[in-house]
Amino acid sequence: MFKALLLENQDGKTVPTLTRLAESQLPEGEVRVAVAYSSINYKDGLAITGKGKIVRQWPLVPGIDFAGTVLESADSRYQSGDKVVLTGWGVGEGHWGGMAEQARVKGDWLVPLPAGLDERQAMCIGTAGLTAMLCVLALEEAGITPDSGEVLVTGAAGGVGATSVALLAALGYQVAALTGRPEEQGAMLTALGASRIVPRSELLVPAKPLEKQLWAAAIDTVGSQVLAKLLAQMNYGGAVAACGLAGGFDLPTSVMPFILRNVRLQGVDSVMCPFERRQLAWQRLARNLPASFFEQAVTEIGLEQVVEAAEAITQGQIAGRTLVKL
């Protein structure tokens, strides 16, 4: 038997219960893992509180990412005792996730934990950090180098944004960090490596088809008006990695930046990212993230506190990462 947080649907309402489950109750999969850490993401908050239509299977153990040790495996890539990390693939939505002492998943969904990272550090990175690394890889593959010019990161105080700032700065890029709370978040972003802070209000003005060229590249987590504005401000040959829609899913832009300035807009998805790409990204995270990244605000909680933390994250009351220690 092992401890787990189980979500059930009772008369249309999501009811979370701390319970004990038997191994036989775990869903099908090739690899059974002893979970060491999970984390609370915004999507987890929506699932656990029932505020968003996230859960696709009842009952469900939530938790969209986790790290731990293989207990048994029918996949030749993994042996008992191996350290692994999981993000994405609909885990914690349509397949039982990381908010339990054990999980059983497909081998294809796991990635071996790279040398230099432990389970706690892996969850400090989590889904957000993997997405950030995939964005950085996209910019590198578009030919953007530290000599290309300034790189803008939007939503810089969020999980993806903050990790993007840290990675780019560690790789030698000049980073401008866009945030809606410059006074509150400026010091943290500077500590992560941002060379300057840009108030979000500067990019909320409606964009002309083309504007003054300001950015060599950008990582955008916001979408909508902000993405349209920065596209109009990209340098000739610039590249934007777009991975979020915190500001909306619309894009009020024109073809002008693409056909007159040779700008590249690259979409980045981490949920269905193939195994080889994930493995590369995790290896790069282990190599490129500075030690100082793991010293930022991190709160550790137990399963007993997850429901309270889920409510808090949906109300914007959580700063930094919240890890769940199993």
What are these regions (language model features)?
Residues 99, 180-188, 249-255:
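Short, glycine/polar-rich helix-capping loops at beta-to-alpha or helix-loop-helix junctions
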Residues 87-152:
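NAD(P)H dinucleotide-binding glycine-rich loop of Rossmann-like/cofactor-binding domains
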Residues 129-130, 155-162, 223:
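Glycine-rich NAD(P) Rossmann-fold beta1-alpha1 loop
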Residues 169-225, 283:
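Adenosine-nucleotide cofactor-binding segment
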Residues 24-40, 51-91:
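Glycine-rich beta-strand-centered segment in the early N-terminal region that forms part
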Residues 279-326:
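C-terminal hydrophobic helical "lid"/dimerization subdomain
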Residues 225-291:
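Glycine-rich phosphate-binding loop and adjacent beta-alpha segment
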Residues 65, 82-83, 102, 150, ...:
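Residue-level marker of beta-strand positions
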